[in-house]
Amino acid sequence: MQMAPQMGYDRAITVFSPDGRLFQVEYAREAVKRGTTAVGIKAADGVVLLVDKRITSRLVEAESIEKIFQIDDHIGAATSGLVADARSLVDRARVEAQVNRVSYDEPIGVEVISKKICDHKQTYTQYGGVRPYGTALLIAGVDDNLPRLFETDPSGALLEYKATAIGAGRNAVVEVFEAEYRQDMNMDAAILLGMDALYRAAEGKFDASTLEVGIVSLQDKKFRKLVPEEVENYVQQILEKHKETENKE
């Protein structure tokens, strides 16, 4: 029986394949691609995070599923991939943020915390006896009156975006953003754009109970999650928009 080309190279995290690939890292990325769709958008007056929690059973309490987390007063994170891995990284980020406050008496920078998380992820691609984190994070916040949005990859790679998505619906969401995103839009418009993209990615199968929204405003530099009533208001606007479009057709 002929062995597959990657046999022997996909078992150990520290072994490169002949064409320079780390298969375990690629498999970790696949875990993210199968996760819930998370969206981040920079606006003129802040930054927005949205997640479609994709409830798979009507018996599950939607409130028990959390995909957007507060890291510090001015920083939030949205996750996709393995839930337990994400929770571990969020806890680590929170500790790093508090250590920075105690050590330097100032809030940690969004880019700094993102790099620390990526540095930690990278070590789990380099040593034997461990596996990569099967999760990606979108880290959003405000630095020096500027909105910041970073994506942390399972490999430890770090990229800053104006708008992006992770998870199962990434390609569909990014396609919407490339066509409709504007840097001068406010947070209201950014939330509506993000929800519209999630609506299209889910082919209309979403409602307020499955959506989580977090924002950081330039005005107060505080992270907060929208309450269900606020989310419902935005959802109704999206549903009405698509209903009008269908009626015209």
Curated annotation (Swiss-Prot):
Location relative to the cell: Cytoplasm
Family membership noted in the UniProt record: Belongs to the peptidase T1A family.
Signal peptide: none
Keywords tagged on the record: Cytoplasm, Proteasome
Pfam families, sorted: Proteasome, Proteasome_A_N
GO cellular component assignments: cytoplasm; proteasome core complex, alpha-subunit complex
GO terms, biological process: proteasomal protein catabolic process; ubiquitin-dependent protein catabolic process
Regulation: The formation of the proteasomal ATPase PAN-20S proteasome complex, via the docking of the C-termini of PAN into the intersubunit pockets in the alpha-rings, triggers opening of the gate for substrate entry. Interconversion between the open-gate and close-gate conformations leads to a dynamic regulation of the 20S proteasome proteolysis activity.
UniProt gene name: psmA
Molecular function as annotated in GO: threonine-type endopeptidase activity
Annotated protein name in UniProt: Proteasome subunit alpha
Stated role: Component of the proteasome core, a large protease complex with broad specificity involved in protein degradation.
InterPro entries referenced in this protein's UniProt entry, alphabetically: Ntn_hydrolases_N, Proteasome_alpha, Proteasome_alpha-type, Proteasome_asu_arc, Proteasome_asu_N, Proteasome_sua/b
Quaternary structure and interacting proteins, as annotated: The 20S proteasome core is composed of 14 alpha and 14 beta subunits that assemble into four stacked heptameric rings, resulting in a barrel-shaped structure. The two inner rings, each composed of seven catalytic beta subunits, are sandwiched by two outer rings, each composed of seven alpha subunits. The catalytic chamber with the active sites is on the inside of the barrel. Has a gated structure, the ends of the cylinder being occluded by the N-termini of the alpha-subunits. Is capped at one or both ends by the proteasome regulatory ATPase, PAN.
